[in-house]
Swiss-Prot record:
Organism whose genome encodes this protein: Prochlorococcus marinus (strain MIT 9301)
Name of protein: Aspartyl/glutamyl-tRNA(Asn/Gln) amidotransferase subunit C
Keywords: ATP-binding, Ligase, Nucleotide-binding, Protein biosynthesis
Upper lineage: Bacteria, Bacillati, Cyanobacteriota, Cyanophyceae, Synechococcales
Enzyme class at the top of the EC tree: ligase
Catalytic activity: L-glutamyl-tRNA(Gln) + L-glutamine + ATP + H2O = L-glutaminyl-tRNA(Gln) + L-glutamate + ADP + phosphate + H(+); L-aspartyl-tRNA(Asn) + L-glutamine + ATP + H2O = L-asparaginyl-tRNA(Asn) + L-glutamate + ADP + phosphate + 2 H(+)
Pfam families tied to this protein: GatC (PF02686)
GO function terms (MF aspect): asparaginyl-tRNA synthase (glutamine-hydrolyzing) activity; ATP binding; glutaminyl-tRNA synthase (glutamine-hydrolyzing) activity
EC number(s) stated in the UniProt entry for this protein: 6.3.5.-
Subunit relationships: Heterotrimer of A, B and C subunits.
GO biological process: glutaminyl-tRNAGln biosynthesis via transamidation; regulation of translational fidelity; translation
InterPro entries noted in UniProt: Asp/Glu-ADT_sf_sub_c, GatC
């Protein structure tokens, strides 16, 4: 099994826009090697009789019925804003025509 080289760590660090010193390079090389060893162990597991899944547990959505409600607090809400025009908030223009 090949070990992670310093050059490989530097390449990954460069892609991630990280600047690593020599100690950090050695540390990351060791950590990446441990991760790859773990993956190699997982690859040896026989999963032929295990059904494919997308999640470890079943996820169920709980829906509620939408209900329309009339709101009488529009004026109160508009008063909270810094600026308004009629029944709308007034905001600074950000798009030039």
């Amino acid at each position: 099994m090949t070990k992670i080289t310093k050059e490989e760590v530097n390449k990954v660090a460069n892609l991630a826009r990280l600047e690593l010193n020599e100690n950090e390079i050695n540390n990351h090389a060791e950590q990446l090697e441990k991760i790859l060893d773990y993956i190699r162990q997982l690859e040896k597991i026989d999963t032929d009789d295990v059904p494919c899944t997308t999640r470890a547990i079943e996820v169920v959505n709980v829906f509620r019925k939408d209900e329309n409600k009339n709101s009488d607090c529009n004026e109160e809400i508009l008063e909270l804003g810094p600026s308004r025009e009629d029944k709308y908030f007034k905001v600074p223009k950000i798009i030039n025509e």
